[in-house]
């Protein structure tokens, strides 16, 4: 089995709720980190097999596949796919694990892993109530298998 290595790590500054970073788009924050990573390592963006990002509550500016949105916001090749993981507080850590598994399985060689989240714009657990206007009070109501 192939081994997986972390070749570098970059992060944004730690923000505060309603602080200096509160108006930054989560994709722009992720793009900033990805660009910094590629500049520091000299890795050719075309050599990247996948972008795996964690993000809690994929709604608003964080909706869709924010991993790919970050990549594209960085001005990088459209040929590189992305996937976003929501494992609550462990989302970015899970992204790193999935990236390592892709390399260890031999299906990928280079994967960018990380995460982005804008809690000043999207309050924690907002995704749980985001569909109220559609008549969906929470993700559980109406499920025959959900036990209260």
Model-based region annotation:
Residues 51-55:
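Short glycine-rich or small-residue beta-strand-to-loop segments that form or flank ligand, phosphate
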Residues 9-14:
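Short polar catalytic/cofactor-binding loops
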Residues 3-8:
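Conserved PLP-binding active-site segment in aminotransferase class I/II-type PLP enzymes
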Residues 1-2, 16-47, 60-66, 71-148:
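Acyl-thioester C-C bond-transforming condensing/cleaving domain
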